[in-house]
Design a protein with these regions (language model features):
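Glycine-rich phosphate-binding loop and adjacent beta-alpha segment
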Residues: 100-101, 181, 198-199, 233-306, ...
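Adenosine-nucleotide cofactor-binding segment
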Residues: 161-164, 179-241
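Glycine-rich beta-strand-centered segment in the early N-terminal region that forms part
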Residues: 22-37, 47-92, 108, 128-130
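N-terminal Rossmann-fold NAD(P) dinucleotide-binding loop
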Residues: 171-172
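C-terminal capping/lid region of NAD(P)-dependent oxidoreductase domains
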Residues: 224, 299-303, 315-333
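NAD(P)H dinucleotide-binding glycine-rich loop of Rossmann-like/cofactor-binding domains
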Residues: 87-165
Length: 333
């Protein structure tokens, strides 16, 4: 079977595609034939050496495929079932505890950049009906991050308002989830072309932050005093503006650090506006099942910019690094 590995010391030129034998599942395990994966910033850090992983680690946290074989005692799955990976396979339900996130797919344990994988029967959830493998593969990290931020932490409801930043995977799927829920969305981008695509997906207002350095003030004017929810992907570069753009008693979900890991913020504004600021890192299996049902009911179709073959993973990461993509980049396995 084709298997992609990250070889020491890391770097896109140290991604190695080799051939390995498919193992047989043991008790409580299943074998999955992965059909597709998708790229996340976390995967880039694993691939380029930004995160230290074991030599020969199989990368990629996102995967969609079908159950190929069952180990003894497995009853929740049947051969042929279509499934998605879990970013944190040990976090099944409830509030996060440290032990839930010690196993990270494609990081501390092997990921989905291989044709076959033997994993715990609890390491996958059901794929949404009506989606292709590539579309489903965009959801376990970016989709679930947006879902937890908006629907679990934010308790988003019809009539609310949302600010999304940029046009990457989390922001685009957050826009789609919000529009399906009857929410008004303001999106920011530095590209007029991407701005038009955001409008096509339902964004009610688009602000070009390259042309409007006071974009958070503009959000306040458009929304009449701030938005109910903010998806912040910029971290250090955008948190101050996110705080300014949120309404009183609003929710800010910190989901990325694309603009830096440190931020200077106006602390009094946080408590004077009584804001709730959440750090959101993907989610658990129960949340992923809820997201799946919502995607089936709303018939949301994830946005894929371009699909690459597994052998072209380095080229896929190069596109991701260029920031020229819109939505998700996927791999066919």
């Amino acid at each position: 079977m084709r298997t992609l590995r990250v070889k020491k010391p890391g770097g896109l030129d140290h991604l190695q595609l080799d051939d390995a034998n498919a193992a047989e599942p043991g008790p409580g395990e299943i074998r999955v034939r992965w059909r597709a994966s998708s790229l996340n910033y976390h995967d880039l850090l694993v691939a380029n050496g930004g995160l230290s992983v074991a030599d020969g680690r199989i990368p990629m946290s996102d995967g969609a495929g079908e159950v190929d074989a069952l180990g003894a005692g497995v009853s929740r799955w049947a051969v042929g079932d279509q499934v998605m990976s879990l970013f944190f396979p040990n976090w099944q339900e409830g509030r996060h505890r440290p032990e839930h996130t010690r196993a990270v797919t494609g990081d501390s344990i092997d990921g989905c950049a291989c044709e076959y994988a033997v994993i715990s029967e609890n390491a996958v959830t059901r794929m949404p009906k009506g989606l292709s493998f590539a579309e489903a593969a965009t959801l376990p990290c970016a989709g679930l991050t947006a879902w937890q931020a908006l629907m679990v932490r934010g308790q988003m409801q019809a009539g609310d308002s949302l600010l999304v930043q940029g046009s990457g995977g989390v922001s685009v799927v957050a826009l789609q989830i919000a529009k399906a829920a009857g929410v008004s969305v303001i999106a920011t981008t530095s590209s007029s072309e991407k701005g038009e695509r955001l409008k096509e997906l339902g964004a009610d207002h688009v602000i070009n932050y390259a042309e409007d350095q006071n974009w958070s003030d503009t959000v306040n004017k458009i929304s009449g005093g701030g938005v109910d929810h903010v998806i912040d992907i910029g971290g250090g570069a955008t948190l101050k503006d996110s705080i300014n753009a949120a309404r009183t008693s609003g929710h800010i979900s910190l989901v990325g650090i694309l603009g830096g890991v440190s931020a200077k913020i106006v602390v009094p504004m946080i408590f004077s506006k009584q804001l709730e600021i959440h750090g959101v890192a993907v989610g658990n299996a129960a949340m992923q099942d809820d997201m799946t049902r919502a995607f089936e009911a709303s018939q949301i179709k994830p946005v894929i910019d371009r699909d690459f073959d597994l052998a072209e993973t380095a080229e896929a990461f190069a596109l991701q690094t260029s920031a020229q993509h819109f939505g998700k980049i996927t791999l066919s396995i």
